[in-house]
Amino acid sequence: MGQKTNPNGLRLGIIRTWDSQWCVNDKEIPALIKEDFLIRQLINNFSKRNSISQIEIQRLKEKTKNRITITIHTAKPGIIIGKDGETRNKIQAQLKKLTQKDINLNILEVKNPDKTAVLVAQNMAEQLENRMKFRRVQKMAIQKAFKAGAKGIKVLISGRLNGDEIARSERHDEGRVPLHTLRADIDYAALEAHTTYGVLGIKVWIFHGEVLPGQTILDTRKPFVSQNKFIKRPRYFKGGKNNHVDAKEN
């Protein structure tokens, strides 16, 4: 059933944790679920497709019930912060008005946007809405993900591709994407692209590696550093090819 389930939800409590973390009574849970939904909706609607990959909400301390800690993970922190923090202050003020509580707003930069499933799907949706060919969009997303250090990626686009009257699905994948392995760190996202021919569905699976005992997801998602050594070619002088500088390794 690994092929049919959401990989993020399937791994909760195993290698992943929840985006909302509370320390409350059972009677308060329904109201807080609705409040968290409205908080995320407000942040995402404030400026659509501003490269937000994750929104974490924490209410962990009993003494600070009237304070909510919100952490926004984004590839473009400058857009969220704004000039002199103007945009950040607006978001914080609207959240305070919505929840009637003190808001501690943190903004963290995503170091690897090319291998973060939500950001990859957002970029693909934007390109499809700009009428770029879907196969080119798929290939570009896969190439960038592998260049960023991903070990496997699968991309699925469904709908009226290229304006065809009959909807269909096109899948392209590279590398390993072990959906049945619960210790496999698989990032998943599903979004929609609104084109002139209708709505296209986009799904992205990215495999970062296996989380071994004693490790966390942060260990498998470290920024990729290339280990390749580049060798300079010989540089020749005008006197002839016999007079040259030996190649040196960096």
UniProtKB/Swiss-Prot annotation:
The keyword Ribosomal protein applies. GO terms for molecular function: mRNA binding; rRNA binding; structural constituent of ribosome. GO terms for cellular component: cytosolic small ribosomal subunit. It comes from the Bacteria. NCBIfam families: rpsC_bact (TIGR01009). Part of the 30S ribosomal subunit. Forms a tight complex with proteins S10 and S14. Belongs to the universal ribosomal protein uS3 family. Binds the lower part of the 30S subunit head. Binds mRNA in the 70S ribosome, positioning it for translation. This is Small ribosomal subunit protein uS3. It comes from Phytoplasma australiense.
